[in-house]
Amino acid sequence: MNTDTEEGIFSEQWRSTTIAVMAAIGIVAYNNLAVSAALPEVGNDLGDVALLPWTISVELLTSGVAMLAVGPLIDSVGARRIFRVGVIGFILTSVLCAFAPSMLALVGARALQGVFAGLVMTVVMAAVGILYPPQTRAKVFAANATVWGVTSVAGPTIAAGLVSTVGWQGIFLMNVPVAVIAAVLAWNKMPDSDEHAERSSLDGRGIALVTAITAAALATAQGSLTLIAVGVVVTLIAAGLYIPHERRSAHPVVRITHIMSPKFRNVHLTSALVVGAGIGVHAFLPIYLRGARGLSIAAAAFSIVWMSTAWSMSAFTASRLQRRYPPEPIIFGASINAFCGTIAITLSVSAEVPIWMLFVSLFWAGSGIGAISTTGVVMLQSRVNLNEMGRINAAHQFLRTVGITYGVGLAGVIIFTTVDRRTGNVETVRELLGGEDSAVNQPVIDALAAGYSYTTFAAVLAMALAIRSARALVRDRVEPVPSAG
């Protein structure tokens, strides 16, 4: 669908399409950043603090499954119709989230929201591969990184203002005008179906099995021996059923080769480890700063700006480096950078250094994560034909999302299990989030700080594993597919 051209992405040929893609990215960017900023106030208002991690994890879980499910449909029915369904659903579920009367209701609304967020994100990533020639894609991802960069500053600023004035509900309601603007700009700009494309049916059985595998695997990270045992058994059974199903199905929800093939698996693994570890630390930063370090609601909400800004800046820088260097060494260098930055975060939290030093460490780690995130997608798109673009993007986004889900889930378990075991009641965190910092709460403060410290150490281990898989990319370099453009 694309043609080779050296024109810029904001030339007359590409301008409207590029703006549409950037607008669609803006939906997901604002939502992801703002929700993390609101966690302390959500926990204080709704209670059931132990469920807080699920307000993020369940959205990631359902968005990941939606990404997989929609990949083959993009290749057959086109991205335009799927984008329209996704953006309308996202608007409606944002309203549901805003008016959730309890933590459990919010978790349910977030599960629905994740489905539609997954549709939008997969469409955007696939559209870049379909619409733009290979030499232009890095520029588009750089433009997308700019959106993330603007949102990384504007999002926390808006979130901090909303949380401290109208409450956490305002964050979800703010999704509505953002999504409406994106819908207007991108409504007719996403690629339509190719009349020669092979038609795919929805793989209902495959979706059910993948959902079971993902949910059961996530259950093993929840700390309970019963859940671990059940999760392992269900994961093995569902995986055993999916393998023969994939071989028999003409249009499986995900092809195993798109995950396990040597030319794909280390890209998936590196990205999932780095992004999952980084967001696991990032998601609970406002809770740590509000509860353990005593920052105000607004200041804690704004704290997420540092890692997300560095993430966006490094994604832009990496896209420029790709014009001169192969992607493999860029990812390897970025993985080392992310590892060193995460060590700095761990030391900053453990030693309780001044807050500004922690922010510098977060910025450092984010600079490595962002480079890997963007470069990995460009690398994958160069390794497949156009008729596989939707599937490979869906598989990658799904695995990244699984990594993030595990990162957030494990971080939540580590933090709140530490608090529960040291104080006997995890709900005591709610008092800290409400601003009660009396001497009676000192054991809770210490437990929350310790739990977050353990979380950062787990992130260091994940970053170390990512260096190994990134090194394998350099060692086993794969040449781009000529027909990828």
Give a label for each model feature.
Residues W14-N31, V35-A37, A50, V58, ...:
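12-transmembrane solute porter fold
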Residues S164-T270, A277:
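Hydrophobic transmembrane-helix bundles of small-molecule transporters
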